[in-house]
Structure formats: structure tokens, C-alpha cells
Amino acid sequence: MTNIRKTHPLMKIMNSSFIDLPAPSNISSWWNFGSLLGACLAIQIITGLFLAMHYTADTATAFSSVTHICRDVNQGWIIRYLHANGASMFFLCLFLHVGRGMYYGSFTLSETWNIGIILLFTVMATAFMGYVLPWGQMSFWGATVITNLLSAIPYIGTDLVEWIWGGFSVDKATLTRFFAFHFILPFIISALVMVHLLFLHETGSNNPLGTSSESDKIPFHPYYTIKDLLGLMFLLLTLTILVLFSPDLLGDPDNYMPANPLSTPPHIKPEWYFLFAYAILRSIPNKLGGVLALIMSILILAIIPILQTAKQRSMMFRPLSQIMFWILTADLLTLTWIGGQPVEHPFVAIGQVASILYFSLILIIMPTVSLIENKMLKW
């Protein structure tokens, strides 16, 4: 008798995606982050749904409703902090996932990579709008500053900003539409994830060696289900420790003050996961130039496959490229630190140097180093 999981119309899709999927036998724990991101998305949708039951998207009551969730709703505080810190976990996994793709040459799977970039932009947009919802000081001023950047677009900029705001400043209309978008986007992300997986399963996964795995495959279950489960345990442990011991570690104290359009916080800054892009934005004195650099800091990922000059796919056996990759990692950490500092000497200068280095490494240095390695290997 044929197994039901192989014949049932719904089950056979699940079976071919998560059970009998032929996977390379040598993929390391760096390949866990896809499933961890799926887990993060599930946590965010579930906690977000429960928060939406008690939240009111109105400027007069938004801040109070979040306070009400934390104080009066059964286990409301844990749901709220799981959602806030879950976002941090989401981005941590995202950055590691993208870094893995760059290191091991997974960007050669161009459709999967490009859908991934669209996913990254969508998740960033969702997180930004979510940060506005508690209607604290940093929520309000963050929304004002970031949406105002669109006014740098020639000719249509000002009209575009007022159209997004739904008025002449960030107000009730802005909050209402941000809540609507913040609610719908995770479901769009879920659909994009399915497309991401669809394209991935067309080609099969890459592996640490960057070589073809066609001759050496093992079933996804039980080998990688168990391996992913271990990663999930570590993720949940980290998230639980963060939520139960220091839930406000990654937040901003200013957001515990209700939004006040008449009082600007001393340092307007986004959540930690946007700081690297914020530092690049601030390091350019021109407004339009800063906005373009901000967009390009993420969009540059799309041209990495074009810039690939190495004959070897993975960086595993390319020590010079490895050094450049870890310099890039250190540079991103430096930009993250700078983004959280005030706009004064020496932080401005450090930010400008780090921004130039970021673009130079990806556009010029890494492709050149790959060519040198080709010569050294006589390829």
C-alpha cells in the first residue's frame, strides 16, 4: 500500500519539502538559519495576533493600550516582550543567513537570492512600522525622521511624504495605516517565504564545499529535522533568557515616554538592527545622497552575483577572501556602533570611513582579491 504522505495532495507537498527532500549530506549548522527564520516568523505572527487583540491604533490611546497589555492582560507582558525581542532574534538570524549566503556562494542560486533580498526589504519595512505602534517618543520621532527622507526625492518628494502621513505631520492617520500594513505584511512575507523555498527546491541547497551534491544526498527527515530542532532549542533558550531577564536590553528608554511632537529626544536612533544603515545614511552630508546610500547598502546584495570573479564558489578554501569577508563583518559591527552614537567628532569621521570601506569591500576589494586568488591557483 502506498504511503498516504506520498499520495495525499496536501501531504505530498509537505513530504517533498520537509520529509523526503534530498539534501546534501555535508551541510553544516550555518544551514539551520532558514528554519530558524521560519520559527521566528511563526512566533512573531502568533504573538502579534494576541497583541492586536488588545492594541488600539489611535494616537490618544495607543501608548496606554500597550501599558494596559503589560499590566492588565494575563501574561500580556511576556507576549509583548516576546514580540519585541523576537524581532531582534529575527534580524540576528537574517543577518547570519545572508552572511552564510555570501561566504559559501549561495548567491549563485539567483532566483532564491533575489527573493531573499525582497524578503529582507519587506521584513525591514514591517519592523519599522511595528516600532512606530507603541507611540512612544522614539516611535514618533523615528517615524517622522525616516518618512521625511522621502522628501529628498526630486519634484514629488514632499507630496509623497504628505501622502504617506495622511496629513501634514505624523498623526492619527499615519498610525492607523502603519498598523494596517504591519498586520498584513507578515502574511505577505509568509507567501514570499514559500516562493523562496519553491526556487530553492528547484536547484537544491548549496553546501560548504560549493561543489555539486548530486551524487551524495540524504533525506531531510530525520537527519536535518533533528539538526534544525537543536538550533531551534538554542534560539528559544536565547529568546527566553532575553525576555525573562532583560527584556528592555535592546530597547530605547525614550520609548517609555508618550509621543510628544513638541519635544525632540536628544538622540533619535532606530532599533539596533537598522543602525548600520542609519550610520551610512548619516555619514553623507547631502540628504538625497544619504537616502541613495541607505537604499544601496541593502540593494548592493543584488549585484553580488554579478561581481563574483572567483572560480571557486565557496570561500572555504580561499583564505584571502575569508579575511576580506571578516573585515566586512567587523566593518558592519563598527557601523552598528556608530549608528547609536551622537553626531559629533570622532564618530562622524569613523562612520564616513566605515561607510566608504563597506562599499569598497563589496564593489572593488573582494572581486579583486578573488581574481588574485584565481591567479595564485593558476586558474
Curated annotation (Swiss-Prot):
Record's subcellular location: Mitochondrion inner membrane
GO MF, any single term: ubiquinol-cytochrome-c reductase activity
Cofactor binding mode and count: Binds 2 heme b groups non-covalently.
Binding residue positions for heme b b566: 97, 196
Keywords, alphabetical: Electron transport, Heme, Iron, Membrane, Metal-binding, Mitochondrion, Mitochondrion inner membrane, Respiratory chain, Transmembrane, Transmembrane helix, Transport, Ubiquinone
Binding residue positions for a ubiquinone: 201
GO CC, alphabetical: mitochondrial inner membrane; respiratory chain complex III
Cofactor(s) annotated in UniProt: heme b
Main location: mitochondrion
Gene Ontology annotations of biological process type: mitochondrial electron transport, ubiquinol to cytochrome c
Subunit structure of this chain's protein: The cytochrome bc1 complex contains 11 subunits: 3 respiratory subunits (MT-CYB, CYC1 and UQCRFS1), 2 core proteins (UQCRC1 and UQCRC2) and 6 low-molecular weight proteins (UQCRH/QCR6, UQCRB/QCR7, UQCRQ/QCR8, UQCR10/QCR9, UQCR11/QCR10 and a cleavage product of UQCRFS1). This cytochrome bc1 complex then forms a dimer.
Further details from the record: Heme 1 (or BL or b562) is low-potential and absorbs at about 562 nm, and heme 2 (or BH or b566) is high-potential and absorbs at about 566 nm.
Protein name in the entry: Cytochrome b
Source organism of this protein record: Microcebus rufus
